[in-house]
Design a protein with these regions (language model features):
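PLP-dependent aminotransferase class I/II
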Residues: 39-43, 51-54, 115, 122, ...
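Active-site phosphate-binding strand-loop segment of PLP-dependent enzymes
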Residues: 108-206, 211-218
């Protein structure tokens, strides 16, 4: 196989002339920071998710942090999060002086489930005086943050029932899942809060940015205030020179320049999502006969943010793809394997058998709406080449290929 002449990046934003024109319009307006365009972006998100409140921020991490602050997560508190996620989901709990309790995920979906949480609760927790206590750390578990990995939505109904049973809040880290649906309903209004990411690699992007949606007015009010230093009124709405600081605050606001990109991206989301769905299905059809590759799970309502495969000899497989000009990534190295989390001495590898099994084999392939037909076919050809290359070497050594049969 002849390698590509240029490297195919793992991810690339899909920016059209319309986004560029909208940004130019804002640049010429004279108002660049948070203002009416940001307000307009929030309104479109609110309508899209059918939520009562939408607040845009400079990152999804900021959204997770402010959600926990609005819910008064503090020292002595803990929050259940999946071990198989990006660090932001857990790090914000530490930032609130609480403890993130890492829970294993389902082996097939890579999602946190009622079962994985209950296995953890049965082993480490007690429910007394209307509070769920984590015995090893002597903390009160305040809530659950589920992660919609790769665009696949967790079973929200079962998690809501579990949260209600133990008097917990339920939030969604939907950094991968803007536009995902659960039982034919758009996510964003189904739990206490939902956080989205508009980072450069996401389905829709503002370069850097995020949003939080909620139906709780008190949560929304606190978050809107905290995102900009705890001011009593937004800068662009002031009619007087004097302002007041009435709560804790941070510098988490999003600018009109970036919101302008988001407005157009959201308008284009249906076409971009359709392209991702096409690529996902094309990969599924092209790889279905590669015995032993565990293909990306099929999930109704997914936003197809990631396309993953599980393959033995993952690192060798990835290196062959790299040699052919195809960038890949790994989502994720489990948090308990990270130095920062290991140094906390809170987590035992024995609790994460599914995470361990997934991490050994998982590999993410390029899937994004800016890919051309040639790009897509290059990925398919490179995967087939890598598969045949490793298969041939195994046969030459008279080893039995350690692939389980693909379901």
């Amino acid at each position: 196989m002849i390698p590509r002449k240029t490297i195919l990046p793992f991810a690339k934003p899909d920016i059209s002339d319309e986004e560029i024109a909208k940004v130019k319009e804002v640049l010429l307006s004279g108002w660049l920071t948070t203002g009416k365009i940001t307000e307009q972006f929030e309104e479109t998100i609110k309508n899209f998710t059918k939520s009562k409140h939408a607040i845009v921020l400079n990152s999804a991490t900021a959204g997770l942090h402010l959600a926990l602050r609005a819910l008064n997560v503090n020292a002595g508190d803990a929050v259940i999060v999946p071990a198989f996620t990006f660090t932001a989901t857990a790090e914000v709990v530490f930032r609130c002086n609480g403890i993130p309790l890492l829970v294993d995920v389902d082996r097939d979906s890579y999602l946190i489930t009622e079962k994985t949480i209950m296995d953890f609760i049965d082993k480490y927790c007690e429910y007394r005086k209307n509070q769920l206590m984590h015995i090893p750390t002597k903390t009160i578990i305040r809530g659950i943050i589920c992660v919609h990995y790769g665009g696949r939505v967790c079973d929200i109904d079962s998690l809501k029932n579990l949260a209600k049973k133990y008097n917990l809040f339920l939030g969604e880290d939907a950094a991968h899942a803007f536009g995902s649906m659960y039982k034919n309903k758009m996510i964003g209004s189904l739990t206490d809060f939902t956080v989205f990411s508009f980072y450069a690699t996401k389905n829709i992007t503002t370069g850097e940015g995020g949003a939080i949606t909620t139906n709780h007015q008190d949560i929304a009010k606190k978050i809107r205030r905290m995102r900009l230093h705890g001011f009593d009124i937004e800068t662009y709405k002031r009619k007087k020179n004097v302002y007041d600081v009435i709560s804790e605050g941070y510098k988490y606001n999003l600018s009109d320049v970036l919101s302008a990109i988001g407005i157009v991206q959201l308008k284009r989301n249906p076409e971009m999502l359709l392209k991702r769905k096409f690529i996902h299905q094309y990969y599924q059809n092209q790889f279905k006969n590669l015995t032993g590759l565990k293909l990306n799970p099929e999930y109704e309502g997914s936003s197809y943010h990631l396309y993953t495969i599980e393959v033995p000899n993952r690192d060798k497989f990835a290196n062959i793809l790299k040699e052919q000009g195809i960038q890949t990534s790994i989502h994720f190295k489990p948090l308990y394997k990270m130095t920062y989390y290991k140094n906390k001495k809170l987590y035992s590898i024995q609790d994460y058998s599914n995470c361990e099994a997934i991490f050994k084999k998982i590999l993410s392939l390029p899937i994004y709406s800016a890919m051309s037909e040639e790009d897509i076919q290059d990925v398919v050809d490179a995967v087939n080449f890598a598969y045949e290359n490793l298969h041939q070497k195994k046969n030459q050594k008279k080893f039995v290929l350690p692939f389980p049969s693909h379901k």
